[in-house]
Amino acid sequence: MTGYPDVAAFDLDYTIWPCYCDTHLHGPFKPVKSSNGEVLTIICRDGYELTIYKDIPRILGDLKDNGVKLMTASRTWAPEIAQEILKIFKVKYAGVVTPLANLFDEFQWGERSKIGHLRDGLKDLYNTSDLKSKKICLFDDESRNKEVEKYGVKFVYVRDPENGPSWKLYQDYLSGKV
């Protein structure tokens, strides 16, 4: 059994939500609030509706409940859009509706390798950039990022652009099946 990592890193585009935030979205953004106060869908000024993948709140919540540090690792060239929508999306965690951004402990952006994102994030979280010093996983939709495995990071390939990371994929990761 793989079990829980120390750090779980998530790409954003096609891993948290089904679009490229730096090309599909233009602010301002209108939140669509559900009856329980969550905001799982936003609408951009062009009318494009964006809903986070349905299992993301459950996956992130389970990781947080088990003491895992959460990190974004995104190559987006428009981090200000990603940051804004992470603050607008709201999910229920520990009985409270909170911005999705609040679930993350570290944010890494920029057009560079995921290895760079992970090293810098680890440096900020633990004052070390040695990727083998912690148990780390990366959820990502781009197979090229499997290169992180050369550095001891478990790569969890999110193959389904319509549904994103499913609870089953997540459970398969935890049990060592992927």
Curated annotation (Swiss-Prot):
Mg(2+) binds at residues 11, 13, 141. It catalyses: O-phospho-L-tyrosyl-[protein] + H2O = L-tyrosyl-[protein] + phosphate. InterPro entries: HAD-like_sf (IPR036412), HAD_sf (IPR023214), HAD_SF_ppase_IIIC (IPR010033), MDP-1_euk (IPR035679), MDP_1_eu_arc (IPR010036). Its main location: cytoplasm. Phosphate binds at residues 12-13, 74-75. It is an enzyme of class 3 (hydrolase). The active site is at 11 (nucleophile), 13 (proton donor). One of its GO terms (cellular component) is nucleus. Signal peptide: none annotated. It comes from the Eukaryota. Substrate binds at residue 75. It is found in: Cytoplasm; Nucleus. Keywords: Cytoplasm, Hydrolase, Magnesium, Metal-binding, Nucleus, Protein phosphatase. GO terms for molecular function: acid phosphatase activity; metal ion binding; protein tyrosine phosphatase activity, metal-dependent. Belongs to the HAD-like hydrolase superfamily. Present with 6190 molecules/cell in log phase SD medium. NCBIfam families: HAD-SF-IIIC (TIGR01681), MDP-1 (TIGR01685). This is Putative magnesium-dependent phosphatase YER134C.
